[in-house]
Amino acid sequence: MDARILNSFDRVAFAVAEKFDAVELSPVSPLGTNFVLGGIDTNNVVATVRNAEVLGDSTPALALECARRRRTHAGDVRLCSSHRMIRLQPFDFPGFTPHFRLFTMDSAGRDTGSHAFEIQHLSEHIHFYLELFRALNAEGFHLRLPLVEIGDVSLSERLLAVAGVDRDKVREAVRAHRPGSGERLQAELGVALPSPVTDPRTELRDIPEPQFSRLCTMKDRVVDPLMAKFPEAQFRFTLARLEGLGYYTGLCLRISPESEDGGRFAVTDGGFTDWTARLLQDKKERLITSGIGTEFVCRRYRAESKPISK
């Protein structure tokens, strides 16, 4: 991959992420960071002999810095970074490789009630990616008609438990680097989670509280304003998503733009975790993480005939 193309992506992304502090991460993190926080299998992480490991996911590393800053900073913390990850697991999907560059973002703060933190920061993360797509399109990329999917991992887990499905089995079988693995597992188990909908208030009346009210709030306070600002984007709520169980703890997002040849891939993923709450031993702490596959986007969504501006 031409490094100048990757650098051009980063230049645009950092410019769009003006609300976030840009952090240059170390290539290694404390031993166990990827597993303890991110749940990444230790067999897929490169460890060193000096109690460190190579970054397999940069969002836990950003979470460590968020927690450090939150100890002395009363306000919200917003961090972003561009970093190359290394994983040891094999990839059999075209375009996926054991080492890859991600642009990631973490936002940390305190729960102030009425889903205020979730509303603000879920909206900010989605807004960033949709604005990024627009900016990249002006630079020779082709990220059209983005599909934004909002899910709730806690609700999906609850529905699976009612159906008698063990969460650990789901985590073993479903992986983000195996597109379609969630759908295949549901078919194998004979489980039918609710189909994606555009308005939970009218189409998901049977789901339990408090998740039902939370999804309705996200529709009113997050989706509707974003739809008005980004008419090219499609929004829907999905409870059939199984990727992220055990990683995220509540609301999650996934964005899939359309490429020039009509293909659609989930290039952006994110959601709320309990990492800073655990690190700071404070259940009121909140954290949302997200990332976009820089290298995959540059390979799959860039129109080669158009030059990158300097």
Name these PLM-found stretches.
Residues 146-151, 206:
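Short internal beta-strands
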